[in-house]
Amino acid sequence: YTTLFRSEAILKLASMYNVTDELNRNVNKPDIRKVPASQDQKDGTKLFELADHLTPDQLRILGPRVTQENAEALHWYSAKYIGYVKNREVTYKYATATYPIFMRECLVKPAEGDTPEVKFYKIYEPLNPDKQWRFSYTPEGVKPKDYINGLSELKALYREFNSREEAAFKKNPANAEKPYKEQKLQEAFICSGERDALCVKSLGFSPIWFNSETYKLSEQDYKEIMKYVEVLYNIPDIDTTGRVKGTELALRFIDIHTIWLPAWLTTYRDQRGKPRKDFRDFMELRSKNEDFRNLMTLAMPAKFWYSKFNEKSRQWDHNIDADCLHYFLRLNGFYSLHDENSSSTKYIRITGNIVKLIKAKDIRKFIREWAQESFLSRDIRNLILNSPKLSDTALDNLQEIELDFTNYTHNTQMFFFPGCSMEVSGTGIKEHPANGSTLSHYVWEENVLKHKVR
């Protein structure tokens, strides 16, 4: 293991010898205390007390490089306890060394004149063995339905940045008669959760994140975020749901640069014994700034053309980026199929677990139709029609993929239908949706069972 990072080698050995750090209900639990409610403690009230700072152990739980300064920048605090009043009794949940409780102050609306600010707290219990109970909010009814975490902090950074830039601009005598034009921040990062966001912050970048992995970013949300940054990155999880949602977002907002975490990450196990999948998991193994910069270098948008204004002709020049073009095609399921028995390229399109054999002209047709459906300008449509980067020869370089077309394992049998797949074993039947299936087996389109499954 001399070629591995130290943390990576430790986790690899732990996996080999089945050494786990799984959450344990008998260990990872709060100190519960119940007392009669006082007269001023009404039923339904949530109580809490915040600590002055986070302990080193608590910071390590949040991320390998997270500091007190990072936590404060995103308004995270450690709670001594949280309490809930019900039936004239207060149930206090005290944090322990093996069960930290964190709270984030979330700004909804800043104070204006005599109107006080509107805010709520997000309660986070990361070591709760029951994952569905890790989050709660207080007070009731204050959190907006479509709240974007980190956006108020991003706006504050934008204001601070432009305040400094404007002061420097006005200090220069050459700008005496010129108006200052506000500048955007370089980038922000959509993260898949609280700890991923803190890890991004610990690297010196600005994170934003949603209250659910299935949150659908609206056009209005996207435009609001882009008021403040030049480039928006997304760091999805690399489990099945994360890949599906990351792909959907990349194709809905084609300027977003997606950072796909490396596949080797899933070969390591987390505290629950499941494959590692998120950015914090990556940071535990590769925590240097250089490691993150390498991921940023590989990030691409689904937008596969770029435009540059030509000062001589006073017109826009348009070009296709071949790397982004092939990435766009992969996002839409287009690959070349590895076949040792054939010297010619076989093009395929994968939809869920169903594979269709296609020709290069089908790929060109897809892009032409997509351009029309997306209402791209005539200049871009002509660029697509005339580009040699969509020729048969160029498409020979489409990413090659190897697929498993067997419909069984040593203990399961698979049946593929148009709308879903069924995995049958001695213990039962598991249904896999057409989009988001965890099956790593595929079927040719002509071999799909033509039956509608209820």
Give the ranges of each region predicted by the language model:
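Short linear loop/turn motifs
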Residues: 15, 23-36, 69-93
